[in-house]
């Protein structure tokens, strides 16, 4: 294991205490000691704030983390709390390969830049443990067959040879860094089942020191680990890199919304149903940028796997985290997953000693606000067609879908004519079979994603649905692409041991890979004859998946409606073959006896599910899969690389290139100066996601990125995905704002990455227009609506924005991670004042924009913006500068956080 985080050199508050377990004495930094010395009512704090407080208490150094940070945070929830940012230094960082590759590319580039000025490149090394889990690269090229897993894995290694060689070099070249090989599982499930310690116990100066396991991760669903009492959240790769290199994350003291759970889930409902309902409730509550902490009697009714499912969805409900404190169930899960019994005793003793152990009779913490969720009122549901917060009760799914068909095109509508509902197409498949697809036909049914494939209750449930369906003689229609991508090999183990996997295979839910697959858009192609027929007839087809995101254009370019559902519901809908059905009342199909088969005929009871989970999910299964996790993938271990400190960049590589972020960087940082002469390159509406800004999926051959790759000799069949090519800025610049579903209001009549180049009036690709503006040394601006940058913690959404020459984004509101990423890349986030937006101000996008920002700017200041139209008329308005802390102004001066880190390392060297 990598080196651990060091504690502070001095015990400033005399808070270092001891506890004893199993005959050993452990040191810890006592929160009670703060309260005893009169520094705040610490015992009343939310558990999540206590973990934050322990982190700053333990790491006070008088420079980065000061006494005032501790004293202030201890006064959380009182009138004495000051507007001082929290400097958070997590104990570790976790990466996945789509975001991890560009992060490691940046580290390699930092080393090159350091060496270029005569510095020591070894100064660029992670200072805390970093785990990278390779899970995002496998694609579902083949599905529904016995050899699908092997074929997809072969293609994964073939496509990603350059990337994997680079990551293999990194594990040798960097300290404190290890990589979990491909085909192991999904990062968050591997974290939950294996990597997380919950409490660290390290030897320091001859003494054993304990403290909470905390982390940041380059994936927004890092929050899944909150389910076991580990505080952590997703950040952009840029922020994670800075954290690896010793920089704290700064953020305002968070509000904490208490989510009080009462009651018990009814029979027939799942953790997925609850998670989707929680997402809807908390989105409506408004928790963006806030912590959510779960408490109340309902917690005791939820197994750890269900808590992890709910915590996983925190980005979808908008919260920074969705925290469940450590309790007896967390300890039970550590036992279930085969953790060391002595360490589990340390976890319990530490948490009890430091007031971090939750018990049913504990007094409720003090929260900013409380929302109550009654588990007994949860019903089976789905979410869609384009956002995870748009909840649809199962009983209302058909009715809702019919309304969505004819509703105006947008988040909850497709904008079709009423007669489109009855459209159908008939054609032959390659095997000669005839098929009929109608509006609403399900083209993809995928059991996928970290959210649900970590949960044995919903996976066993899906297997039981399959078993009952097969026994009754039901089959999946031949146009449905079915797939099963478990989050870890443990899942396969218990599906085999329970005898359910053969039934899932019988319905086409064969193993396709251990990774994110369909949930992130790696759904692979549909059969060519299906793609041709659907495209030719413009048929509206759908997907049903057990994922966490269903944004437009994400799952498959031809699939316009995407619905999130539990794994058992995915199987049920796959059997039906359409979302235009009332599963509660209509027959799903006809059985082998000629009788109609209904939903209740195949739906398992909780007693059936619980019995199989208890019988088949065992500690031995977890130990078996993880004891040799770093050695099992021979192809990974046979990759030949060097351990040299400096990476040998290959100019001909189309996967890995040295990015230009540090070219022509001055020794000293610049100043905050007014922005003049900006042209509008994009004018967008609400809910522009990071998928819209920087897609992860397929690269079209006629897109700027596709043309670049073809010029480099890459054939379209070898394009791979945008996500896999995030180590090459040339591809990613061209892919910025290239989502096929993005709608730019200043390129009317188009869909996709187009804009109007104002000097000539020509409609062209956003990339080509930006390059022309760059030649003219014209800065650019983007105008947007609410929730700009929602979705994945995709740093390339900000990196690409920067490289295109966009100097500022003016939006009605920003999602947390993307706003931070813009600042980290030296792009100014501005927010319209409440009640104003581009349309209310009469902005068409043709204007020249000026922003009066300078060295006097402070966090959340109002600045004057002028929009000068073609006739010279000026619209003047004020916007909020979304620097949320003083240090963010420094990042902006430096041109970005990595430039600041490099300048500091240069001085040290």
UniProtKB/Swiss-Prot annotation:
Highest taxon above the source species: Bacteria
Cofactor binding: number and manner: Binds 1 [4Fe-4S] cluster per subunit.
Protein name listed in UniProt: Aconitate hydratase A
Family matches, as InterPro entries: AcnA_IRP_Swivel, Acnase/IPM_dHydase_lsu_aba_1/3, Acoase/IPM_deHydtase_lsu_aba, Aconitase/3IPM_dehydase_swvl, Aconitase/IRP2, Aconitase_4Fe-4S_BS, Aconitase_4Fe-4S_dom, AconitaseA/IPMdHydase_ssu_swvl
Organism: Bacillus subtilis (strain 168)
Misc. remarks from the entry: Whether aconitase is active as an enzyme or an RNA-binding protein is determined by the status of an iron-sulfur (4Fe-4S) cluster that is essential for the catalytic activity of all aconitases. Citrate is both cotransported with iron and a chelator of divalent cations, including iron. If the intracellular citrate level becomes excessive, iron will be sequestered away from iron-containing proteins, including aconitase. Since excess citrate greatly stimulates aconitase synthesis via the positive regulatory effect of CcpC, the cell will gain the ability to metabolize citrate at a higher rate.
Known pathway: Carbohydrate metabolism; tricarboxylic acid cycle; isocitrate from oxaloacetate: step 2/2
Entry GO MF terms: 2-methylisocitrate dehydratase activity; 4 iron, 4 sulfur cluster binding; aconitate hydratase activity; iron-responsive element binding; metal ion binding; mRNA 3'-UTR binding; mRNA binding
Residues where [4Fe-4S] cluster binds: 450, 516, 519
Induction: By citrate via CcpC. When citrate is absent, CcpC binds to the sites near the citB promoter and blocks expression. When citrate is present, it causes a change in the interaction of CcpC with its binding sites, resulting in derepression of citB. When citrate is very abundant, CcpC activates citB expression, presumably reflecting a change in the interaction of CcpC with RNA polymerase. Also induced by decoyinine and nutrient depletion.
Gene3D superfamilies named among the record's database cross-references: 6.10.190.10, Aconitase, domain 3, Aconitase, domain 4
Assembly and oligomerization: Monomer.
Keywords assigned by UniProt, alphabetized: Iron, Iron-sulfur, Lyase, Metal-binding, RNA-binding, Tricarboxylic acid cycle
GO CC annotation: cytosol
Annotated knockout phenotype: Cells lacking this gene show a dramatic increase in the concentration of citrate. This accumulation of citrate prevents sporulation due to chelation by citrate of divalent cations required for proper functioning of the Spo0A-initiated phosphorelay.
Effect on the protein of changing residue 741 to E: Same aconitase activity compared to the wild-type. It is glutamate prototroph and accumulates citrate. Exhibits overexpression of the citB promoter and accumulates high levels of active aconitase
């Amino acid at each position: 294991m990598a080196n651990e985080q060091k504690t502070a050199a001095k015990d400033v508050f005399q808070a270092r205490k001891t506890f004893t377990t199993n005959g050993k004495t452990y040191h810890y930094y006592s929160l009670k000691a703060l309260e005893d010395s009169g520094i705040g009512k610490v015992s009343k704090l939310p558990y999540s704030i206590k973990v934050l407080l322990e982190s700053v208490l333990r790491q006070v150094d008088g420079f980065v983390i000061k006494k005032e940070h501790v004293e202030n945070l201890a006064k959380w929830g009182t009138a004495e709390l000051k507007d001082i940012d929290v400097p958070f230094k997590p104990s570790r960082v976790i990466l996945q390969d789509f975001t991890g590759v560009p992060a490691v590319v940046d580290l390699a580039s930092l080393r090159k830049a350091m060496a270029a000025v005569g510095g020591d490149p070894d100064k660029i090394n992670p200072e805390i443990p970093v785990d990278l889990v390779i899970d995002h690269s496998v694609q579902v090229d083949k599905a529904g067959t016995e050899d699908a897993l092997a074929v997809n894995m072969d293609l994964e290694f073939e496509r990603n040879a350059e990337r994997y060689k680079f990551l293999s070099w990194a594990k040798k070249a960097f300290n404190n860094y290890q990589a979990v090989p491909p085909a192991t599982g999904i990062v968050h499930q591997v974290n939950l089942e294996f990597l997380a310690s919950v409490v660290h116990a390290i030897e320091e100066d001859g003494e054993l020191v304990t403290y909470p396991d905390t982390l940041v991760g380059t994936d927004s669903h890092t929050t899944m680990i909150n389910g076991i009492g580990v505080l952590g959240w997703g950040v952009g790769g840029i922020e994670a890199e800075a954290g690896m290199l010793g920089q704290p994350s700064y953020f305002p003291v968070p509000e904490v919304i208490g989510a009080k759970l009462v009651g018990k889930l009814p029979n027939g409902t799942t953790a997925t149903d609850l998670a989707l309902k929680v997402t809807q409730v908390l989105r409506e509550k408004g928790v963006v940028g806030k912590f959510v902490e779960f408490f109340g009697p309902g917690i005791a009714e939820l197994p750890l796997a269900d808590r992890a499912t709910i915590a996983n969805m925190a980005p979808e409900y908008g919260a920074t985290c969705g925290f469940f404190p450590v309790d007896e169930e967390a300890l039970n899960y550590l036992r279930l997953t085969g953790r060391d019994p002595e360490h589990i005793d340390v976890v319990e003793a530490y948490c009890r000693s430091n007031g971090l152990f939750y018990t049913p009779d504990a007094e409720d913490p003090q929260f900013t606000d409380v929302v109550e969720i009654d588990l007994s009122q949860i019903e089976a549901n789905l979410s869609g067609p384009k956002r995870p917060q748009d909840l649809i009760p199962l009983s209302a799914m058909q009715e809702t879908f019919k309304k969505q068909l004819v509703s105006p095109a947008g988040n909850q509508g497709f904008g079709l004519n009423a007669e489109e509902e009855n459209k159908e197409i008939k054609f032959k498949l390659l095997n000669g079979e005839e098929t009929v697809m109608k509006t609403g036909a399900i083209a993809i049914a995928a059991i996928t994603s970290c959210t649900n494939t970590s949960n044995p209750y919903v996976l066993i449930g899906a297997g039981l649905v399959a078993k009952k369906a097969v026994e009754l003689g039901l089959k999946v229609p031949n146009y449905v692409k079915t797939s099963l991508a478990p989050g870890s090999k443990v899942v396969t183990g218990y599906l085999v041991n329970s005898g359910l996997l053969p039934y899932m295979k019988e319905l086409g839910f064969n193993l396709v890979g251990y990774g994110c697959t369909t949930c992130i858009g790696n759904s692979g192609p549909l059969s060519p004859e299906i793609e041709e027929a659907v495209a030719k007839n413009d048929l509206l087809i759908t997907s049903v998946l057990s994922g966490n995101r269903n944004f437009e254009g994400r799952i498959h370019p031809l699939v316009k409606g995407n619905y999130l559902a539990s794994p058992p519901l995915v199987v049920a809908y796959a059997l039906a073959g359409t979302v235009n059905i009332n599963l509660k009342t209509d027959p799903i199909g006809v059985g082998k006896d000629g009788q109609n088969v209904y939903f209740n005929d195949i739906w398992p009871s909780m007693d059936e599910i619980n019995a199989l989970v208890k019988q088949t999910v065992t500690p031995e299964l977890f130990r078996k899969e993880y004891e040799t996790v770093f050695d099992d993938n021979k192809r990974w271990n046979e990759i030949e690389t060097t351990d040299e400190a400096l990476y040998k960049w290959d100019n001909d590589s189309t996967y890995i290139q040295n990015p230009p972020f540090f070219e022509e960087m001055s020794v000293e940082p610049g100043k905050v100066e007014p922005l003049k002469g900006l042209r509008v390159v994009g004018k967008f509406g609400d809910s522009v996601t990071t998928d819209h800004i920087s897609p992860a999926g397929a690269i079209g051959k006629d897109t700027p990125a596709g043309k670049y790759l073809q010029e480099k000799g890459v054939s379209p069949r070898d394009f791979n995905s945008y996500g896999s090519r995030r180590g090459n800025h040339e591809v990613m610049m061209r892919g910025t704002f290239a989502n096929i579903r993005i709608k730019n209001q200043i390129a009317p009549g188009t869909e996709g990455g187009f804009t109007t180049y104002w000097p000539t009036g020509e409609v062209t690709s956003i990339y080509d227009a930006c390059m022309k503006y760059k030649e003219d040394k014209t800065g650019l601006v983007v105008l947007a609506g609410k929730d700009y940058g929602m979705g994945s913690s995709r740093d390339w959404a900000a990196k690409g924005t920067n490289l295109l020459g966009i100097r500022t984004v003016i939006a009605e509101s920003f999602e947390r991670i993307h706003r931070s990423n813009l600042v980290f890349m030296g792009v100014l986030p501005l927010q319209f004042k409440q009640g104003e937006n581009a349309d209310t101000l009469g902005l068409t996008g043709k204007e020249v924009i000026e922003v009066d920002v300078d060295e006097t700017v402070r966090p959340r200041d109002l600045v004057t913006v002028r929009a000068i139209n073609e006739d010279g008329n000026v619209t003047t308005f004020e916007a909020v500068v979304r620097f949320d802390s003083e240090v963010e102004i420094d990042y902006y001066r430096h041109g970005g956080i990595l430039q600041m880190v490099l300048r500091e390392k240069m001085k040290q060297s």
